[in-house]
UniProtKB/Swiss-Prot annotation:
This is 2-oxoglutarate-dependent dioxygenase ecdK. Due to their effectiveness as antifungal agents, echinocandin derivatives can be used for the treatment of human invasive candidiasis. It comes from the Eukaryota. Pathway: Antifungal biosynthesis. Belongs to the iron/ascorbate-dependent oxidoreductase family. Keywords: Dioxygenase, Iron, Metal-binding, Oxidoreductase. Fe cation binds at residues 206, 208, 266. SUPFAM superfamilies: Clavaminate synthase-like (SSF51197). It comes from Aspergillus rugulosus (Emericella rugulosa).
Length: 332
């Protein structure tokens, strides 16, 4: 099982034939593995290096500066800084399935800290920023990266609708007044032995809460996706180019398509090259994840087009905000 690499220019500026071929390849990749890689999306190597530099600069801030914008834990969209181990993904996806139940893995710990923002114009759940003099230019850069990622992911939804032979706005039309989120992840260095003991992971197997995710990762390794041919196994997805994105299906797209497209189960753990090195230490790892999400009051029930006429929908009606609250509530 391998992850397809797609050239975004084939859809963004391609001919009608190229756009349809891109959409079909995207659908094939999502159907087979739940993941694709995306290149030539408009972010340069310099811009990607810059966002990772901001990642480092933010997490290098003194604890008291980060604590001043701490995320208020609970069942709501995350905003600001979450300390090491605050979020517990070991509670998610019992049995590796999309579920609103809480797993009983109450002794599992995450070895990561993260910083989350939503749309700049969000008045309901406002962003929390370091003071401008602390990190001059940080807020502007993050907001710009957010907006460009939003545009890319909306085009991917258009491509998917084209391949699935549904109206162009089937998915995109639910994203006006969106509630997308952007996250910086920092996984501090950690002894290999700590992870091998089985109580701590960089991030446990889980699916993402949104529609699709756009992930940029450094070259340290450790990202693994479920092998759908052998569901108890995971396969590494290493970075091959500094500008590539890993794109995966989230919960809401699985729900909208009535399970036709399945959310991609993934984890971050010890890279294969470091396994069985009990005395070794995993180096610091960084990533940047953009989570495309719909308007908060839009439904995340199965869309009627994907429900056969003689069957009931697999996923019940609830708003995107209610779904987010249920899922976020599980990890705290």
């Amino acid at each position: 099982m391998s992850v397809l690499t797609l050239d975004f220019t084939k859809f963004h500026s391609g001919s009608e034939v190229e756009r349809r071929a891109f959409g079909q390849a995207l659908l094939d990749g999502f159907t087979t593995t739940g993941f694709v890689k995306l290149i030539n999306h408009g972010f340069s190597k310099e811009e990607m290096a810059d966002i990772f530099n901001w990642n480092q600069r933010f997490f290098d801030l003194p604890i008291d500066r980060k604590a001043a914008i701490r995320n208020d834990e609970g069942p709501k969209p995350q905003r600001g800084w979450s300390s090491l181990g605050a979020e517990k993904t070991g509670f998610l996806n019992p049995g590796g399935k999309l579920s609103l139940a809480r797993a009983s893995n109450n002794d599992r710990q995450d070895a990561k800290e993260h910083f989350d923002i939503g749309p700049a114009e969000d008045e309901e759940f406002q962003n929390k920023w370091p003071e401008e003099q602390t990190l001059p230019g940080f807020q502007e850069t993050m907001n710009s990266y957010f907006d460009r990622s939003q545009a890319i992911t909306l085009e991917l939804l258009e491509a998917l609708a084209l391949a699935m032979d549904v109206p162009k706005d089937t998915f995109v039309g639910l994203c006006h007044g969106h509630a997308s989120e952007l996250r910086l992840n920092h996984y501090p260095s950690i002894p290999v032995k700590t992870i091998e003991e089985g109580k701590t992971n960089r991030i446990w197997p889980h699916t993402d809460f949104g529609i699709i995710t756009l992930l940029a990762q450094d070259d340290i390794g450790g990202l693994e996706i479920q092998d759908r041919n052998h569901p108890s196994d995971f396969l590494p997805v290493n970075r091959e180019d500094s500008t590539e994105f890993v794109v995966n299906i989230g919960d809401i797209l699985e729900r909208w398509t009535n399970g036709r497209l399945r959310a991609g189960l993934h984890q971050v753990t010890t890279p294969r090259s470091m396994q069985q090195k009990g005395n070794g230490t995993l180096p610091t790892r960084r990533s940047v994840a953009f989570f495309l999400k719909p308007h908060r009051q839009m439904s995340v029930a199965s869309i009627s087009h994907f429900v056969p006429g003689n069957q009931s929908p697999r996923y019940e009606d609830m708003t995107a905000l209610a779904y987010q609250q249920l899922r976020t509530g599980i990890v705290y």
